[in-house]
């Protein structure tokens, strides 16, 4: 599957050309159009590609018009055999929904159910659903609520899981593992994506690990577990550093999220490159435990970062910029800082952030305080300094 950003109606013609050239070469990988802020683009793309992703929060500004346009989209999908992903993000909930339910997991569930009910009314079931958030608690609760309601109404659409804007490095992997594994362990979810602000291929090993683990092809390397009330002591014998990190996250992320445990002590060994057995020392154990507690929203020892993986709308080096922002803000414990690839989705999808760095394109950046842009058209070369200046102001 290849997903392509489609920001304007003109790009729909490019989609058709891309598809034609691929098919001429005997490449039949399905194409997915990722569409935001335009129901007309979604309708046009549905006649070309195998799947269209829409976001209910920005499909159309007017709710009644959105329902009319969605009915048109469904008909085009039916005629062309096109699948549909209803992909809601926590940060882009519409004002009508948040006025009714707040900015909550319940609001996410209710928003998606409105659209699924329209699918049911139109006898259209070629649909997959996602309810992503950068907050693992919000993400897991939203999926649980939706899964429960779909069971109650007797219509279970497949769920695509992911923690959006998870960031990079160990933190991004741990956060993704915590959210996704909590749901997979409950039998919720059919497909997954691990979203990292890194080269895209780095997402695959983590996603493959999760798929293998919850399809019973892979098991934890934990060799012993001691429980004393809400404190757990776990000992591992892992074949690699990353395997230890992922096993630890999956074994205890859900229990921490659901407050079954309050503390985890990590011990054991892992194998470094060169087959050298390495003892998990107290410093590394504390680091992984801190990262896990932060990912599970139980204790914050550093800033919380929100960073998208980038897409066709990103016009700057997102990963390197994010790494610099992390380095220069590492002392701001508990603050939520977002680094987003584009002005199209960035402001909405970083709704939880205290501060945001959002690419505009053409070498310019917008800086946000909460949901409000406080500086626009800042040259990239100055933007991080400006962000830090603003943060330091009383």
Task: Give the label of every model feature segment.
Residues 344-349:
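Acidic, divalent-metal-coordinating active-site segment for phosphoryl/phosphodiester hydrolysis
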Residues 1, 48-63, 186-200, 260-278, ...:
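Glycine-rich phosphate-binding active-site loops on the catalytic face of alpha/beta enzymes
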Residues 362-365, 372-393:
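Beta-strand/loop-dominated core regions that host nucleotide or nucleotide-derived cofactor-binding catalytic loops
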Residues 89, 96-332, 336-339:
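Catalytic alpha/beta core domains of metabolic enzymes, predominantly
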Residues 1-115:
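Active-site beta->alpha loop and helix N-cap motifs at the rims of alpha/beta catalytic domains
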Residues 48, 229-230, 353-355:
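Active-site-proximal glycine-rich helix-loop-beta segment
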Residues 331, 354-355, 364-367:
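Catalytic-core signal marking the mid-to-C-terminal active-site face
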